[in-house]
Structures are given as C-alpha cells and as structure tokens.
Amino acid sequence: MEKYEGYNLRFKDALIGVQFLFVAFGALVLVPILTGLDTSVALFTAGIGTLLFQLITRKNVPPIFLASSFAFIAPLSFGVKEWGIAATMGGVVAAGLFYVALSLLIRLKGEGFLHKILPPVVVGPVIMTIGLILSPAAVNMVMGKGKEALYTQGQSLTIALISLSAVIVVMMFGRGMLRLVPILCGIAAGYCASLFVGIVDFTPILSAPWFAVPSFTAPVFKLEAVIYMVPIAIAPAIEHIGDMLAIRNVTKENFLKNPGLKSTLLGDGLATSLAGCFGGPPNTTYSEVTGAVSITKAYNPAIMTFAALAAILLAFVGKLGAALSTIPAPVIGGIMLLLFGIIASVGMETLIKNGVDLAEPRNMIIVALIFVCAVGGMVLDFGAMSFSGVGLGALIGITLNLVLPKTKHFDGY
C-alpha cells in the first residue's frame, strides 16, 4: 500500500502485524522488567489498549501501536515499593483519566490552550528530569550494586558493555527493519554473553507451563499514589502529540484534524486506564512502530489489529514470561545507560527545536527550578498528599509558566 486508504482488515496482513510487534517487543517488555510488573500482563494490556484506541478513533484510525511507556519507569518503581502494585495501578488509572480530561478540554477549547499551559519551556526540562532521575538505577545495575548484586562487578560491567555495544552498533549501522530493534538486539547479545559466563538460571523456564493466565492485579485507589502518578502523564501527553505529527508526516494523512487530538488523546488515556485495571504499565504510542510503517509503507491500520492480537496471544504463553524473567540485571542495565540518556536528550531537543531562549530570565528560572527541585529530591508534603520527583517538577514548571510575566520581546513558547 503506497498511500493511506483507511482501515481494511485483510488476513494477508497478519504476518506484517507480527513483524511490527517484534519491533515493539524489546521496549514493551523492558518497562515491566524494570518496574517489577508482569511482562505477560504488559503484553496483554498493550494488545487490548491498541484495540481500544482503534475503536475510539474508528472514524480515521492512525496506524500506530500502543505499549509500555518509558516515562513512567521511575514512578512505577517507586510506587510498587512504596504502596504495592494494586495502589500503583490506581495511580495509573488516574493518569489515564488525566489524558481523558485533556481530550475533553481540547474538545471544548481547542488545541491552543494545551500549548499555553504546557509550552516547550516546561515540557522540555520535565522530560529531561525523567531520564536524569532514572540514571542512578541504571548505573547500579551495571555496577552490580543494590538488590541486583548477584554477580561480581567484573561480570556485571562486561555483560553490560556487550549489551550497550550491541545497541550502539545497531543504532549506528543497522539498516532497514534491523535499525528499529536495537533494544531487542542488545538484550540478545547480553543474554548470550550471560549464557557464556554461566549466570542464567533456566529453572523458571523449565517449571513454567506453556499456557498460563497472566498475573492480573486489580487497582486499589490510594490518594498518595494518585497524586504522585497523575503529573507524570504530562510528558507522555506531549509525546503523544509528537507521535501524531510523525505518523501524519509518514502517511500524509492529517490525523491531527481527523480524528483529531480530542479522539487520539481520549483513546490513549482510556488505554492507559484499562492497563491499570489489569495491572499493566501505562500505554503510549510507539515511535519504533511508526518507523517500521515508514520503511514498509504498510499504512493499513488493520495491521496494528493483528499486532495487538498477537500480543494478547503471547501474553498467555507461560514459558515466554518465564524466559523474560531470566534476563540478568546487567543486560538491562547496559541498555538503560543509553536509553535514560536518550530520554534526557529528547527533552533537550524539545528546547532547541522550539527555540527556547535560555538567556531569557523567565525561561532560565523555569528550567532551573524544575531541574533542581525534581532531580535534587525535594518533597512537598501536605499530609494526605505529597509531591516529589518528576511530578513536583511538572507542577512547579506549570505554575511558574502561568505566574511569571512574559517580556515584550519574547513570549516564552
């Protein structure tokens, strides 16, 4: 298909759908591995989330795939340790409803208000803090420290370096579809190195059944978890707009107009809330799959239906989930060194692309306070609720952007 022609369910496209799932697979399973969630549940919620998104945008379905969001790695990890999976999932449901609220406001007031309260001078540094806050966890995994201290430092560093090198080589020199799966290649290379060193335990795979129902977890709503999780949704909400622009450029179909952000954000939000209802990580649009669409010219959104169905089926393969649980921490740590840095650089790119002048005192103040308060570990505790990390940084940025006066020669966004 050389141009976008709308949704057309054809069984001959099923194999392409499986191929697209393969592209998303590495990043999809990485989030639950890092946050202590179930990888099989993540596969299931990615599948049903994508199908729900297609149902909501049925007037003009964009060819995109929804799966685990990297923006929520730090808050999910903290939430699981602090309140448990059930309460953290309550926060995920609420974060999805934040998307829904944004979609309703866009429906009522248009898209302009979104750029007013969330300009690049706020969004850029908030995205950067996500990567910076996560970086110590990656370093600890690479160095064999903390709870992951199951191997010698030499083993950890060697395996992490192999994983990292594989990702870099594929990103730099890969061609075609190979270039879209650097995470998967990094996991494969690191896993092979781990096998050579002899630190992989196959017991979980041997004892797992072929068919197994994922370990679903129902949400429990705890105010602290909800307050902590909702502000994190700001960054992926903006990322969603960027992905809609990207798929528009690839297909030459203006999805920002039809079905419009009011529908795509609604679909993304409800998919995230649905994921929280089952115990899965929040969903977001996957730019890797958009890249695959660009390379293959396979614009039919029904292909994503097959990718979603394949993800749901794989969620019930018990041995797959068990195999993913045997991946040693240094393998993941090596990949995370690069990915968390990339997240931070995406925030920097947001500032640069939009011409945010950091010599302007107003912008300098907003960026500086977001950084120091979010990364420095500041906590605002109001008893029943508290703000810290990325959520606190986002709150400070939004407040300062609305309160600080704009100069006549520069409006700040």
Predicted segments with their positions:
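Membrane-embedded helical hairpins/re-entrant loop segments and their flanking transmembrane helices
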Residues: 2-11, 36-54, 58-60, 231-301
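Hydrophobic, membrane-embedded alpha-helices of multi-pass small-molecule transporters
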Residues: 14-27, 153-164, 181-182, 214-243, ...
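Transmembrane helix-boundary motif of multi-pass solute transporters/channels
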Residues: 16-53, 57-87
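Membrane-interfacial helix-loop connectors
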Residues: 32-36, 40, 70-83, 293-296, ...
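Interfacial segments of multi-pass membrane proteins
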Residues: 75-81, 171, 289-304, 310-315
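Membrane-embedded alpha-helical modules
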Residues: 81-201, 308-413
